[in-house]
């Protein structure tokens, strides 16, 4: 551009509309040769068209601090919607408008075309489940969660039409950070997960827009504010005991190592009692609220069928959680290494139901019942553990909506992201009973996506050899694994089931525990 004074006095030429192909060649703009003109003055920054969502946050990366201070503060967006057009053509049997990554997942899922056509909404539900931006592992997990950019809600599908527009509401809720876990010997796909709550709102009556906006406002008010790290640390200081656990406990022996913490056995110096100690590095915990939740629940809820919380200490950023030690290990070792008879299974189910009846009576849902979270004493005692995922329910919120637990043990209403109540624990107990029969939960050998589809659509899973089970046991399983939540038994009801009257004494579990330990030694 020339610095000629004459050009400086000329007004700028009107802007010329150019097609994108002119710039795509990479050469000089051919039109510029015909106009010895200065470019149009730049539009003031405040008036630039910009993306409503991205530009609010991009200033921290591109703009200077000075500019930030000059601009009025703008709060992050709330209640914004990300619309995804996903349809299902009943004639061709194909989804339309599906995100590319979901399409790739579906292609390798082993969900047949017939299954997709039979229940396309269930397919979308399980694809949403695999949205890795919302799937979280619990604390002490061995592998850090992967993050991916996905829409945060599952499109709702209207199968009556060939294509529908689905509105996905992205909420800034408590469950969005990477999440806390327990050490489990199973493959990654059997580990506990935690995902954001996504429930489609009940549509407002036609023409009554105020009802919908009022409901949203009410939901916002009910949502509890997210605690800052400092608030969490302050809360922890009010919960824990003062002192140094290294002085109160001795003979530390490591029995487990996770990505963000370690589990030891140790001995109480004063009492000579053997305990289990979780040492958790809080700096590595992106979901610290779950730790507070677990401590508070275990502190308040004392029951013979729940692993006893003993104490907790905070030393710098290290949290020490001291718990009762059960030397028999987890029920997983027994179900994978030995064969249980029906009377032994009945004994374990009875003890777990006693724990669940107590929890549910205290308005607590465990949400992660599986053999990994049932610990055994050498004398055969059976106790539930791992309350990082438990949820309290109130009269105002009698149903939960967060997808949480472990995929193969999940109730259908959780997989399909419906509101749920305490009976999700009963379904998981039924799956655990099948574990005790077959050594693993149903669908474990299926592709995980297809397994979720089958859980969502099949109802009660089929047993490998149902004829080998007594009618009374099959009836107990059917009561636990009833697809209709209203017909599914409660913990209180199932404690009266005739199957539990077959239970052997708990001491009958001791030979199984010893056999499992021996088998595991041989496998090393």
From Swiss-Prot:
SMART domains named among the record's database cross-references: PBD, S_TKc
One annotated GO molecular function: protein kinase binding
Biological process terms in GO annotation: adherens junction assembly; bicellular tight junction assembly; cardiac muscle hypertrophy; cell migration; cellular response to starvation; cellular response to transforming growth factor beta stimulus; dendritic spine development; intracellular signal transduction
Chain ranges of the CRIB domain: 74-87
Naturally occurring in which organism (per UniProt): Rattus norvegicus (Rat)
Acidic residues composition bias: residue spans: 169-178
Modified positions (N-acetylserine) in chain numbering: 2
Modifications after synthesis and translation: Full-length PAK2 is autophosphorylated when activated by CDC42/p21. Following cleavage, both peptides, PAK-2p27 and PAK-2p34, become highly autophosphorylated. Autophosphorylation of PAK-2p27 can occur in the absence of any effectors and is dependent on phosphorylation of Thr-402, because PAK-2p27 is acting as an exogenous substrate. During apoptosis proteolytically cleaved by caspase-3 or caspase-3-like proteases to yield active PAK-2p34.
Domain of life of the source: Eukaryota
Biased composition (Basic and acidic residues): 67-81
Protein residues bound to ATP: 255-263, 278
Residue positions where N6-acetyllysine is found in the record: 62, 128
The UniProt record lists the keyword Transcription regulation: no
PANTHER family, per database record: NON-SPECIFIC SERINE_THREONINE PROTEIN KINASE, SERINE/THREONINE-PROTEIN KINASE SAMKA-RELATED-RELATED
The name this protein goes by in its record: Serine/threonine-protein kinase PAK 2
InterPro entries the record matches: CRIB_dom (IPR000095), CRIB_dom_sf (IPR036936), Kinase-like_dom_sf (IPR011009), PAK3-like (IPR051931), PAK_BD (IPR033923), Prot_kinase_dom (IPR000719), Protein_kinase_ATP_BS (IPR017441), Ser/Thr_kinase_AS (IPR008271)
Subunit structure, interactors included: Interacts tightly with GTP-bound but not GDP-bound CDC42/p21 and RAC1. Interacts with SH3MD4. Interacts with SCRIB. Interacts with ARHGEF7 and GIT1. PAK-2p34 interacts with ARHGAP10. Interacts with RAC1.
Domain Protein kinase as annotated: residue spans: 249-500
Modified residues (Phosphothreonine): 60, 134, 143, 154, 159, 169, 402
E.C. numbers: 2.7.11.1
